[in-house]
Amino acid sequence: MIHQRTLKAPVTASGVGLHSGDRIRLTLRPAPPDTGIVFRRTDLPEAADILCSPELVNDTRLSSTLVTPDGVRVGTIEHLMSALAGLGIDNLYVEMTAQETPIMDGSAAPFIYLLQTAGIVEQPAKKRFIRVLEPVGVAEGDKWVRLEPYDGFQVSLEISFDHPAFRLAPQKVDIDFARTSYIDEIARARTFGFMYEVETMARMGLGRGGSLDNAIVIDDEFVLNRDGLRFPDEFVRHKILDAIGDLYIIGHPLIAAFSGYKSGHAMNNQLLRQLLARPSAWEYVTFSHSEDVPSSFHRIPHLA
């Protein structure tokens, strides 16, 4: 059968919070089968477990943030969640000493490294997938996102920025993960922001830890990072990285085609809520034999 996965051993890293600017210690620990992804704020007097779920995403200002009914926050989780999706990890305890995960270099690659360093093991329980059975969509003005039935996992995403740096690169990417490696083609794409946004973010109490070391920074004309871009279309690739992380908040891999135009964290979360609200639009599935699994999931890296 296709098994659930967790880590072989705990692993710890430290970094800066993108929005808080706090120094954060992050520890990833193995979890039993059917646990899901559980966050723990170890800086609080009572470190309650927060199970990752779409219903708890209650702040989407520039990131995806879980907020419990009693106000405990766990923010900027999308890059870590994207890495977990890319490695097929189902069960994990995520301990953190602040209200957001560290930004690392602005991509998912450092999290991939951490997880692979810890090692990944299969567990004696079937991995559960969510298969989309009917189209589900969310639209707002000219922005939209959609999930459609598809025997695998594919992403088609387009962004639209009227800016010289963006006009030099493709702003649309179509990826079928049956033929594309998440680690090679998506994980290294970094978050990005504009210089003119810094003042606005500061008024919102956000972006205090941002720098050229953990984001692509763009002025009125150019990318300011000395080494430039990692991919010609790194901007839209990072949006795909974000979307994969946002979608994995549902707790299971999606067997579906995801597409979007000018979408972001808020719309991605609305899409998951719309899906879950329509029981006829989805089903849980498991697989007893690897040959029955859609080929998109054959590219998930072998166990470390």
From Swiss-Prot:
Coiled coil ranges: none
Reaction catalysed by this enzyme: a UDP-3-O-[(3R)-3-hydroxyacyl]-N-acetyl-alpha-D-glucosamine + H2O = a UDP-3-O-[(3R)-3-hydroxyacyl]-alpha-D-glucosamine + acetate
GO cellular component: membrane
A molecular function (GO) term: metal ion binding
EC number: 3.5.1.108
One BP term from GO: lipid A biosynthetic process
Top-rank taxon, per record: Bacteria
Keywords, in A-Z order: Hydrolase, Lipid A biosynthesis, Lipid biosynthesis, Lipid metabolism, Metal-binding, Zinc
Pathway(s) where this gene product acts: Glycolipid biosynthesis; lipid IV(A) biosynthesis; lipid IV(A) from (3R)-3-hydroxytetradecanoyl-[acyl-carrier-protein] and UDP-N-acetyl-alpha-D-glucosamine: step 2/6
Cofactor(s) listed in the protein's UniProt record: Zn(2+)
Active site: H265
Binding site for Zn(2+): H79, H238, D242
Function in brief: Catalyzes the hydrolysis of UDP-3-O-myristoyl-N-acetylglucosamine to form UDP-3-O-myristoylglucosamine and acetate, the committed step in lipid A biosynthesis.
Protein family per UniProt: Belongs to the LpxC family.
Protein name from the UniProt record: UDP-3-O-acyl-N-acetylglucosamine deacetylase
